[in-house]
Amino acid sequence: MIKVVLVDDQTLVRQGVKSLLSLAESIEVVAEASDGQHAIDLIPGIKPDVVLMDMRMPVKSGLEAIQELAALKALPPTIILTTFDDDELVLAGIKAGAKGYLLKDVSLEQLVEAIQVVSKGGSLVQPVMTQRLLSGL
C-alpha cells in the first residue's frame, strides 16, 4: 500500500482527490494538510511514501514547503498537483526537489500511475508539460 499525503488549500479538491484515490487498491491517503506550513509540520512525523502538493496556497506555498522539507532532509517523493502550467513553476518545483508535476485535469489513471512511478523512485512530468519544456530549449 502506497501511503499518500494530500496538501491543498481547497477542501473540496482534497476531498475529491481523496475520494478518487480510494478507488485505487494500492493507494491510501493517510493525512491531509491545508497549506505549506501545515505540510511542513505534518509530513516528517508521518513519513508518507508520496506527497501530492498544490503550488499556490496561503501561509506557505507548495514550493516553499518543498524547499523547507528538502532542507530538513524530510522531503518524501513529491508530485506537484496544480492548475498552474507555468514553465517557470515547473522548473522551480523540480529544482526544489519535486519528482513529478501534474495539472489537476489529469485522469485518475494518470494520477495513480504517477504516484506508483514516483513511489518507486521515478519521476513523471505530465507529457504536455514535458513537450512544452523541451520545445523551449
Regions picked out by a protein language model, each given a short descriptive name:
Residues 44-46, 68-75, 96:
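Conserved phosphotransfer cores of two-component systems
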Residues 8, 54, 82:
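Active-site residues of response regulator receiver
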